[in-house]
Amino acid sequence: MARSHRKTNTFTIGTEMNIKPANTCDYDIVSLGEVMLRLDPGDRRIHTARSFDVWEGGGEYNVARGLRRCFNQRAAIVTGLVDNSVGRLVEDFMLQGGVDVNHVKWYPHDGLGRTVRNGLNFTERGFGARGALGCGDRGNTASSKLKPGDIDWEHIFGE
């Protein structure tokens, strides 16, 4: 439960964190969620496509990117990615979107994806009477491995 301290203009969550006043924060928005590599088959179906355009995507990230691009808000993402070529591609897309990636937790790649992976999202476009269709491949992803202590929340929100 947050409570206001009139003298310092900060907020305390429990007894563990003092939250900075908004005018002293590094970010206008910080999103926490999975950022995946999105594969788009164009006008084709996923099961018949032989090539895909690639993008980044994820609900929470999309909000941060949209606020950055449309309203010039200072945006950051907190997520987990595997330190391999796919993870670095997702990072590059996020940087192109203007979102701060300094709070990404990087996981080592085991060479096979047995211990941790980057999420994939295949998305067919909707047109005419056909609705959009998504097919996620999100098992054992880096962001699902985030646990308490992995992120320095005091650095992000605290004094």
What residue spans do the PLM features occupy?
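A generic fold-level signal
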Residues: 24, 47, 58, 115-117
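Low-complexity, intrinsically disordered short segments enriched for Gly/Pro and polybasic residues
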Residues: 1-8, 112-118
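Residues at secondary-structure transition points
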Residues: 51-58, 85
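A general structural signal for well-ordered alpha-helical segments in protein cores
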Residues: 29, 60-64, 87, 119
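Conserved N-terminal subdomain of the carbohydrate kinase-like
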Residues: 74-159
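Positively charged, low-complexity intrinsically disordered leader regions
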Residues: 3-51
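Alpha-helix C-terminal capping segments
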Residues: 55, 62-74, 96
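Gly/Ser/Thr-rich helix-start
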Residues: 34, 58-60, 81
